[in-house]
Amino acid sequence: MAVEPPRRGDVWWIAFDPSVGSEIRKTRPAVIVSNDAANEVLRRLQVIPLTSNTDRLYPGEAIVQLNGSPRKAMADQLTTASKERLRERVGRLSNGDMIAIERAMRVQLGL
C-alpha cells in the first residue's frame, strides 16, 4: 500500500536533532506549510515547529489547536526538513489555524 505524502496543514512529529545554536531541537510536532505539489515530489518540505509553551506570544507566532490542546506555532523557526525526519502524523490543523500561521509567517518574513 502506498503511503500518502504529507500535506499542507498536517502536523507530524519531526526529529529536529542534531541542531546548532538556537535552532529548534528534539523531536516535536511541526505543521507542514509547503505546498502540496512540492510535497508530493520533493524529498524535503517546509515546516513550522509547535510548542506547548503558550505563555508569551511574539508577532511572528500564532496560537493553534492541535487535537483540542493549544500550541504555539513559531514562524521564526520556519525550516526545511528532509522527509526522513518525519516520524508520525499527529493531526491536521483547521483552515482558521492555517490562516493564523500564514499571518505569522508574513510578519516574520516581512511579506
What is each PLM-predicted segment?
Residues 1-111:
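Conserved functional hotspots at enzyme active or ligand-binding sites that engage polyanionic ligands
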